[in-house]
Amino acid sequence: MLVLSRKANESIKIDSNIEISILEIKKDSVKIAIKAPENIKILRSEIYDIIKEENKKSILQDKNNIHKIKNLFDYFNK
């Protein structure tokens, strides 16, 4: 992990197409701006974690549904 220090109105470049700018620094928060191509997904980590958990639940539900469908299929094809 790379750790950098930046002041307000300074920025960081990632590759040639992503720029992270420090807009404002307050007592307990930092406001940043991120310029990136539209195909790059940018999410707050807590939102990403929620999405990841919901996807896991969905996959488990899909597995259960597939099992139920298979059982129905087997039942009607006896």
Curated annotation (Swiss-Prot):
SUPFAM superfamilies: CsrA-like (SSF117130)
Keyword list, A-Z: Bacterial flagellum biogenesis, Cytoplasm, Repressor, RNA-binding, Translation regulation
Compartment(s): Cytoplasm
Principal subcellular localisation of the protein: cytoplasm
GO cellular component: cytosol
GO biological process: bacterial-type flagellum organization; mRNA catabolic process; negative regulation of translational initiation; regulation of bacterial-type flagellum assembly; regulation of carbohydrate metabolic process
Gene Ontology MF annotations: mRNA 5'-UTR binding
Domain of life: Bacteria
Function as written in the Swiss-Prot or TrEMBL entry: A translational regulator that binds mRNA to regulate translation initiation and/or mRNA stability. Usually binds in the 5'-UTR at or near the Shine-Dalgarno sequence preventing ribosome-binding, thus repressing translation. Its main target seems to be the major flagellin gene, while its function is anatagonized by FliW.
Subunit (UniProt): Homodimer; the beta-strands of each monomer intercalate to form a hydrophobic core, while the alpha-helices form wings that extend away from the core.
HAMAP family with a match to the protein in the record: CsrA
Sequence similarity: Belongs to the CsrA/RsmA family.
Protein's UniProt name: Translational regulator CsrA
Native source organism of the sequence: Borrelia hermsii (strain HS1 / DAH)
GN (gene name): csrA
